[in-house]
Amino acid sequence: MRILFFGTAFISETYLKELHKKCHEIFVVTTPDKPALRGQKLIYPAVKVYAVKNNISFIQPEKFTLDVIETIKNFAADTGVAVAYGKLIPKVVFDIPKYKTFNIHFSLLPKYKGAAPVQHALCRGETETGISSFYIEEGLDTGGIIIQEKLNISIKDNAETLLNKLILLGIDVMNKTLELFRCGKCDAASQTGDPSFAPSLKKIDGLVNWNKRAGEIYNQFRGLYLWPGIYSTISQGKLVGKRIKFREIEVFDSDSINKDSGIVYSAEKNRGFTVSCAVGRILVVKMQSENKPVVSAWDFIQGRQISAGDRF
């Protein structure tokens, strides 16, 4: 098939590789290069890097001008596939291919519409998620569902492990969707159920609210594992004012009622230290203070950098 592929990030690259492996004819639309944080060097989108290496035609439009639209039309695509493109695709573009354009979304729509469905599902303690292939419309993730497949979420899953599972499931859903189109089947079902939203993450999302239950804080850790991580500032103790990132935590107990929350409660030999929550306690296993390497929480408390009774 002739496929118009919209994608940018490393996730998108995995899907482009799959299409290339299947010997489809591909034309890539990706985002412009971005300047590095320091210096003048430009960072290429992962999809562009793969396209250049494999002699796949691509464009990087800032906007979908008339010339860009004409270039896309001239490719005469059978369908369009969008995976983590990162920009809105206008109707005049997504309607160009014979079978329109579909998106691979990492949730069971209409749940978790938006840019960060995996992270928000984990933060809210969901036990099930999945992949949706759906036709792109002008609304946010509102189009008709072509295929949905479910995936159970393990309590040990974090954003990295769950994302890896969903990437593989999404590739399977993409291939099944393309096979439907190849057979001339392009039906879709309207989305049903109450929608929920998964907006882009911000650094402040990682701030721990100790007045929550231990399980809720653990879910926050799981969801924000890749970025921005979870953190808190010491408000009472030797390191007052220092921000601590929690690199590995566990639920130590889930139902104790604590008079105060955010208190370093106990040292647990060779494991770390516990912190009280509104209900329950978390066990800090690995941590990182500002501008320092990641260390064992047990070693940190042994070094008397933090003590029972200190407060976050």
Curated annotation (Swiss-Prot):
It comes from the Bacteria. One of its GO terms (cellular component) is cytosol. InterPro entries: Fmt, Formyl_trans_C, Formyl_transf_N, Formyl_transf_N_sf, Formyl_transferase-like_C_sf, Met-tRNA-FMT_C, Met-tRNA-FMT_N. Gene3D superfamilies: 3.40.50.12230. It catalyses: L-methionyl-tRNA(fMet) + (6R)-10-formyltetrahydrofolate = N-formyl-L-methionyl-tRNA(fMet) + (6S)-5,6,7,8-tetrahydrofolate + H(+). Pfam families: Formyl_trans_C (PF02911), Formyl_trans_N (PF00551). Its EC number is 2.1.2.9. Attaches a formyl group to the free amino group of methionyl-tRNA(fMet). The formyl group appears to play a dual role in the initiator identity of N-formylmethionyl-tRNA by promoting its recognition by IF2 and preventing the misappropriation of this tRNA by the elongation apparatus. This is Methionyl-tRNA formyltransferase.
